A protein has these predicted regions:
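Helix-terminus/linker motif at the lipid-water interface of multi-pass membrane proteins
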Residues: 28-30, 89-120, 135-139, 174-184
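Interfacial/gating helices of multi-pass transporter permease domains
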Residues: 36, 73-77, 81, 97-119, ...
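Helix-loop junctions and terminal segments of transmembrane helices
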Residues: 3-4, 62, 114, 118-162, ...
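Transmembrane alpha-helical segments of multi-pass transport proteins
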Residues: 279-320
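Interhelical loop/hinge segments that connect adjacent transmembrane helices in multipass membrane
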Residues: 9, 13, 52-97, 107, ...
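Alpha-helical transmembrane segments of multi-pass membrane transport and lipid-handling proteins
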Residues: 24, 28, 32, 126, ...
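Alpha-helical transmembrane segments of polytopic membrane transporters and translocases
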Residues: 48, 80, 95-97, 109-126, ...
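Short runs within selected transmembrane alpha-helices of multi-pass transporters and secretion channels
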Residues: 1-3, 14-26, 39-55, 84, ...
Length: 320
């Protein structure tokens, strides 16, 4: 209800209250010698407080009754989302499993650091934006023309932000890794660059997913997820023998393929062809790539890692 009503202030207050209390208890338990159980208690307490505070503020409580009609309606919608979510979870963990089995501890560490850095702009910012945009899309599900306008507008804004951040991070990967993690982790820079190119497409994929959910076409969500994972697993199997860099490059290829799949199914629910969607994205992509080329060229003239970051970030901001 709070998300649909766009009451993010109350959600923030509830989340912050739960975090403060649970972290306080966690710190106390850590100092009194509870060890790893501290993390267990802190996580459980945080979730319990969130539930209790939401119940108290929203005044909604579950009833001890079962509605077959509601179950059928929700199952038809939610079961496909559940299956697509399971496919995504299995695939994500498959990469970690393969890397852990096939490569050395050093390479696993380099990949892990590169992966974490690449997620900060793409996944986290997109997740925050989605919480605001999804209710807007749902509110216009009966008005396809307005839904189409919202989709184009917010897609371009989000992609301008994420594309610029990811391409900027790609160009500054080496100095950032050396500054934050020291030069011992410098091999992670190449992996970070490849993953930045891969995950810059995440907001496009996610926006297609949001539109399909907003109009209730979770069958398209599941079909698209099956196609994506078949392609991604095939790419994974082909790149395993070629090394960890090839695997990261394979992720980029897979996610670009996912963009085309998502756009194809989105074009079926709103009057916006794949060509028109790319036409909307092209100016944003051109600006971001031009910025990347420019700051990369500037970086070639600077040797010091700190100076590169200090000079190139303001230039990138002014460029965009």
């Amino acid at each position: 209800n709070l998300t649909v009503d766009m009451n993010y202030k109350l959600q923030a207050i509830i989340s912050l209250s739960a975090v403060v209390v649970s972290c306080g208890v966690g710190v106390y338990l850590a100092y009194t010698g509870y060890g790893v159980w501290t993390l267990v208690v802190q996580t459980l307490l945080n979730n319990m407080l969130n539930v209790v505070l939401l119940w108290c503020c929203v005044r909604w409580f579950p009833l001890l009754s079962f509605s077959l009609k509601s179950f059928k309606e929700l199952f038809n919608f939610g079961s496909k989302l559940l299956l697509s979510g399971l496919l995504e979870t299995i695939y994500t963990n498959l990469y970690t499993l393969v890397i852990g089995k096939k490569f050395s501890a050093d390479q696993v560490g380099f990949y892990n650091r590169a992966f974490v850095f690449s997620q900060l702009p793409s996944y986290n910012i997109t997740f925050i934006i989605n919480r605001v945009i999804y209710p807007l899309l749902c509110a216009q599900q009966e008005k396809p023309e307005i839904l189409k306008q919202h989709y184009i507008h917010y897609l371009r804004l989000t992609c301008l932000l994420i594309f610029s951040l990811m391409i900027g991070l790609c160009c500054l990967a080496d100095p950032i890794i050396n500054i934050v993690l020291t030069d011992r982790w410098s091999p992670a820079a190449v992996l970070l660059q490849l993953l930045c190119i891969a995950y810059m497409w995440y907001p496009v994929i996610n926006f297609n997913y949001l539109v399909l959910n907003a109009v209730g076409r979770t069958d398209y969500v599941l079909k698209s997820e099956v196609l994506k994972k078949i392609n991604s697993v095939a790419v994974l199997l082909l790149t395993i023998p070629l090394g960890i860099k090839a695997m990261c490059a394979g992720i980029a290829v897979s996610l670009l393929f996912n963009v085309f799949v998502g756009m194809f199914f989105t074009s079926k629910v709103i009057s916006l062809s794949m060509r028109e969607q790319w036409k909307e994205l092209l100016p944003v992509l051109t600006i971001s790539v031009s910025m990347g080329i420019f700051i990369y060229g500037v970086g070639l003239l600077i040797d010091n890692a700190y100076a590169k970051v200090a000079i190139e970030i303001p230039i990138a901001v002014l460029f965009v």
